[in-house]
């Protein structure tokens, strides 16, 4: 990448800011847990991290987790159509399966495909989102080559409150939701969220007949119960359930198909905290059942069933005020099988992984440092070790210099290893080496984070023939190098708050120097919000650069503008409205093997009524 790139990027952000009145930006030291699997304030985290709070989500009036994520630096969301359709999250240009996704501490990545589905998680249910960019495999193991996304639905405070929410929009888009949380007694607190949503949708692929639409319906449940046994011991239970029916177009024929999914996860933990030591033993289980096929008629659908059983024991010691140690062990057992119209099953239906890790965090005076090491033992490919090092130097209260380096890996999925007649049980894990340098500046009128990163991924799994004229099978054939620069700036102009993020990246396939598919080289986001006693307004502009697809076609760059407003009629009743794609921009999100484009949604609107008591 050109050396002038960073200078140009900094100039583009700093030039308008120099004319602002010097007013202090409030930097809230939010408590986070995702970066190192223990609680710490956000400013002490050396990894690049973004945190979105409940208040910020409500200001934007968005409906899904993906709407929130696409405004953050380093996050690119690609959907094959509208809400509920297949979506990919490219964290710093890595594949969707390279991002670990947690919901209330429980992994929801698919055991069969590797990625995670976030398109139907309602924003109404979310209390906080933490996004850690850069590899965290030395702490979490497989799936965290690109980073970690942690969605939290359990409120941190104990205030009793209830929310009833109704929404309606174009394409007969409707939602009904309820949220309750608070104290059941002096030692027990609980939370509950229910959401029911449906829409007729729109024509998501040009191959579909004119007049077709592809809708969805979903029901979502979240729940938690925490009981404090005494001052040191507590137990917690939490769960997540999703049932959905999503229509989509067959990429070759255009015939309307339907995907029916039932997913649930449940977790229980025993927690101990006394003085400088804390420990958590968590047991969880998740199950996923999906059926795919023609939406109408008598044709049988194919089915996939998968489950994951997990046990984690985490320990955290504050040795001295400057030094924190953490260590833990993880065990995961995954199962998968096929059914319905699938005539044959996976060649193997079970695999497991055992792991142990240790991490240390040191902070004193101007120096912050961290180190982590982890060893995984996978039944499919054996042992694999990963590590991570980070260093921060803060010569003043206004600036901190950060550098980090580490390794990661992605284990082959069930589909890669054991798919009937084409799985490859000899696959190795994909591996990565990454490095990052950054500057965090806390000036009186602006907060700026600048990061430059490089991630090299080897033994990437892709389809290839076993030999001349041979059968095609997943193989360790690809290598990739992704370099990029991220900038995020927080500042105020009068009563309006701004969050501007920009990313320039160079995601390349090292075998032929081509660009990785569906990744833009430039992404920009500008979020502006205004809040008064009763009225709030927000505007979100997103620019996505041009992208190439596997078919060789290029999707043009596009810019979308979304606006929203809230009006608090009483202390309890709030009205909200949002218009997405305000200027009705036509754009493509992918090019299918059938020769047609997946298209994004045109101008759309959604209005809500929320009653809180």
UniProtKB/Swiss-Prot annotation:
InterPro entries: B12_transptr_BtuB, Plug_dom, Plug_dom_sf, TonB-dep_rcpt-like, TonB-dep_rcpt_b-brl, TonB_box_CS, TonB_rcpt_b-brl_sf
Example of a GO MF term: ABC-type vitamin B12 transporter activity
GO biological process, one term: monoatomic ion transport
Keyword Lipoprotein: no
Record-annotated TBDR plug domain positions: 41-154
Signal peptide as annotated in the record: 1-22
Subcellular location: Cell outer membrane
Motif TonB C-terminal box: chain residues: 591-613
Domain (TBDR beta-barrel) ranges: 159-613
Motif TonB box, residue numbers: 29-36
Gene3D superfamilies: TonB-dependent receptor, beta-barrel domain, TonB-dependent receptor, plug domain
Domain of life: Bacteria
Membrane topology classification: Multi-pass membrane protein
Alphabetical keyword list: Cell outer membrane, Ion transport, Membrane, Porin, Signal, TonB box, Transmembrane, Transmembrane beta strand, Transport
Single GO cellular component term: cell outer membrane
Main location: membrane
Function comment: Involved in the active translocation of vitamin B12 (cyanocobalamin) across the outer membrane to the periplasmic space. It derives its energy for transport by interacting with the trans-periplasmic membrane protein TonB.
HAMAP family: BtuB
Family indicated by similarity: Belongs to the TonB-dependent receptor family. BtuB (TC 1.B.14.3.1) subfamily.
Protein's name in the database: Vitamin B12 transporter BtuB
UniProt source species: Vibrio vulnificus (strain YJ016)
